[in-house]
Amino acid sequence: MPVKLCYLGNTFINSSDYQGRLKESTQCGAELIGDGSISADAEILSMTVESMLESGLKNFQISVGHSQFFYGLTKAAGLSGEQEEDLRELIANKNFFGVEVFVDSLSMNDKLRKLFGLLDNFDLQDEQLMEALKLAEGYDEILSSIDTLLKLREYLKAYGIEKYISYELGLISDYTYYTGIIFQGYTYGTGEPIVKGGRYDKLLSHFGKDAAAIGFAIVVDQLMAALSRQDIDVPVIENSSLIVFEEAAYHAAIKRSMAVSYTH
């Protein structure tokens, strides 16, 4: 049976990229472990969108890509490890003019060149993904990644959240453990993602459990900053109760607290 978990806590990132920035942040997230299906991908994305809506946000977008598209593309083009890192940095910095210059310097066939040309499209439509699928014939990793995104679109229609989802083949992550879809959420009032997530089917094997998994993490600090800058009030549920009692009234107090809990 799949396991569903949620959490809230502080995380620490020790990276040179975080110079001048806080290395500690608060995250709230959920994980679905033991289900490697596309329907599980859709469920987590739906939960991500629902979480954003429950926070009070109305204008946000979740960009969805696939980790294996980038790896498949660089493998098919025969890039060295150093070239792959150079390209990754250009894409991460959204330097697509640099990407164009980089790709022009490489020798490859027209199909691969057209696939590289999709890296700067932040909102791929069905027909563009279908065209990419045709171009990817003969390149299994690229083909599989695009096919997964097309199937995912169909699953997401059941949730009615299409307007919050966009598809971006140039989406990459700083973390190399992702094996399937990856996604990031953005809104007004913050330059950083407010939520990140993806599929990591091989990560748990390093901790003694071989299981498919997918999850997301809301960056609470970024979310709160966005809510403040958009003048969105965070709803406060005022239904808490405080029961004060003497030791002799312990049993009665417990019964009362349970009754209060069940009514809220």
Regions found by a protein language model. Give the residues of each.
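Short, conserved phosphate-binding/catalytic loop or strand-edge motifs used
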Residues: 23-28, 64-72
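Acidic, His- and aromatic-enriched active-site or binding-groove loops in soluble protein domains
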Residues: 79-98
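Positively charged, Gly/Ser-enriched RNA/tRNA-binding surfaces
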Residues: 1-57, 103-262
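Short, surface-exposed, charged loop/turn segments at secondary-structure junctions
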Residues: 77-80, 183
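Hydrophobic mid-domain F-helix/FG-region of cytochrome P450s
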Residues: 50-54, 69-78
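Short, surface-exposed recognition loops or helix-turn segments adjacent to catalytic cores
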Residues: 59-69, 87, 166-170
